[in-house]
Amino acid sequence: GIMDSVKGLAKNLAGKLLDSLKCKITGC
């Protein structure tokens, strides 16, 4: 349903944000 796709999008965004934070902190 719509909520499932919203949750999926949120997970993708959170993952990208976490990855970029890790890159800034520890280097990629």
UniProtKB/Swiss-Prot annotation:
- Intrachain S-S bonds: 23-28
Looking at the UniProt record for this protein, which Gene Ontology cellular component terms does it annotate, in alphabetical order? extracellular region
What sections of the protein cross the membrane?
none
Q: Which GO terms describe its biological process?
A: defense response to bacterium; killing of cells of another organism
Top-level taxon in the UniProt lineage:
Eukaryota
Expression across tissues: Expressed by the skin glands.
InterPro entries membership? Antimicrobial_frog_2 (IPR012521)
Q: Which UniProt keywords apply?
A: Amphibian defense peptide, Antibiotic, Antimicrobial, Cytolysis, Disulfide bond, Hemolysis, Secreted
This molecule's function is given as: Antibacterial activity against Gram-negative bacterium E.coli. Very weak hemolysis activity.
Family (UniProt): Belongs to the frog skin active peptide (FSAP) family. Ranatuerin subfamily.
Q: What is this protein called?
A: Ranatuerin-2BYb
Origin organism of this chain?
A: Rana boylii
Task: Specify the taxonomic lineage.
Answer: Eukaryota, Metazoa, Chordata, Craniata, Vertebrata
